[in-house]
Curated annotation (Swiss-Prot):
Component of the proteasome core, a large protease complex with broad specificity involved in protein degradation. CDD domains: proteasome_alpha_archeal (cd03756). The keyword S-adenosyl-L-methionine does not apply. It comes from the Archaea. Belongs to the peptidase T1A family. It is found in: Cytoplasm. This is Proteasome subunit alpha. The formation of the proteasomal ATPase PAN-20S proteasome complex, via the docking of the C-termini of PAN into the intersubunit pockets in the alpha-rings, triggers opening of the gate for substrate entry. Interconversion between the open-gate and close-gate conformations leads to a dynamic regulation of the 20S proteasome proteolysis activity. GO terms for molecular function: threonine-type endopeptidase activity. One of its GO terms (cellular component) is cytoplasm. The 20S proteasome core is composed of 14 alpha and 14 beta subunits that assemble into four stacked heptameric rings, resulting in a barrel-shaped structure. The two inner rings, each composed of seven catalytic beta subunits, are sandwiched by two outer rings, each composed of seven alpha subunits. The catalytic chamber with the active sites is on the inside of the barrel. Has a gated structure, the ends of the cylinder being occluded by the N-termini of the alpha-subunits. Is capped at one or both ends by the proteasome regulatory ATPase, PAN. One of its GO terms (biological process) is proteasome-mediated ubiquitin-dependent protein catabolic process. Keywords: Cytoplasm, Proteasome. It comes from Methanosarcina acetivorans (strain ATCC 35395 / DSM 2834 / JCM 12185 / C2A).
Length: 247
């Protein structure tokens, strides 16, 4: 009998070596998801997602992986999209309740902790399953860019730059080599796209990329339009075209 037999059927039962297999399986769903990237810059924070469209018959606009939570907060997701939408809807309600109750926008760390608390409860009660999605939550607090990662267990970490999804390892390798805290948002977007290019082995274009930004200047979340994304993509393609031709 396999060592985990029986222990992977109940979310509330630890295996003898201290593991919750259902939580680990939920993390595997994230690892198989599309690659999402978050980067803090000197003047804001950026989110990028490679939507990985698998069929030319799919309308690219119908696939959404970056969501607005509040005026100053956005989130990128990897894993089960339906689970992510449920969490995003909950986060939006929490943000609205905070505005009504306190007449001020909710903090990025506060909303991240609330989502993590909710995800954590789904790891300790019977009759439910963990959320099979991870979120990168980005925004601006007190004139500082903030970037948090939430995983299916409810764990919360703040990063300068990170990634979730299938290409995480390749992206993080690029970040560890090239990330600088003093880079601006333009440079951060190009770094993120460069990392996604390498993670996807060059198989990406403007139609598969989604980009969201929050700047310190106006503290507003917005998604980049197709022409803006195309401009950055062309810079990356030109860079790698030059690199490949010189080799």
């Amino acid at each position: 009998m396999a060592p985990q037999m029986g222990y992977d059927r109940a979310i509330t039962v630890f295996s003898p070596d201290g593991r919750l297999f259902q939580v680990e399986y939920a993390r595997e769903a994230v690892k198989r998801g599309t690659t999402a990237v978050g980067i803090k810059a000197a003047d804001g924070v950026v989110l990028l997602v490679d939507k990985r469209i698998t069929s030319r018959l799919v309308e690219a606009e119908s696939i959404e992986k970056i969501f607005q939570i509040d005026e100053h907060i956005g989130a990128a997701t990897s894993g089960l999209v339906a689970d992510a939408r449920s969490l995003v809807d909950r986060a939006r309600v929490e943000a609205q309740v905070n505005r009504v109750s306190y007449d001020e926008p909710i903090g990025v760390e506060v909303i991240s902790k609330k989502i993590c608390d909710h995800k954590q409860t789904y790891t300790q009660y019977g009759g439910v399953r963990p959320y099979g999605t991870a979120l990168l939550i980005a925004g601006v607090d007190d004139n500082k860019p903030r970037l948090f990662e939430t995983d299916p267990s409810g764990a919360l970490l703040e990063y300068k730059a990170t990634a979730i999804g299938a290409g995480r390892n390749a992206v993080v390798e690029v970040f560890e080599a090239d990330y600088r805290e003093d880079m601006n948002m333009d440079a951060a977007i190009l770094l993120g796209m460069d990392a996604l290019y390498k993670a996807a082995e060059g198989k990406f274009d403007a139609g598969t990329l989604e980009v969201g930004v929050v700047s310190l200047e106006d503290k507003k979340f917005r998604k980049l339009g197709p022409e803006e994304v195309e401009n950055y993509v062309q810079q990356i393609l030109e860079k790698h075209k030059g690199t490949e031709s010189s080799e």
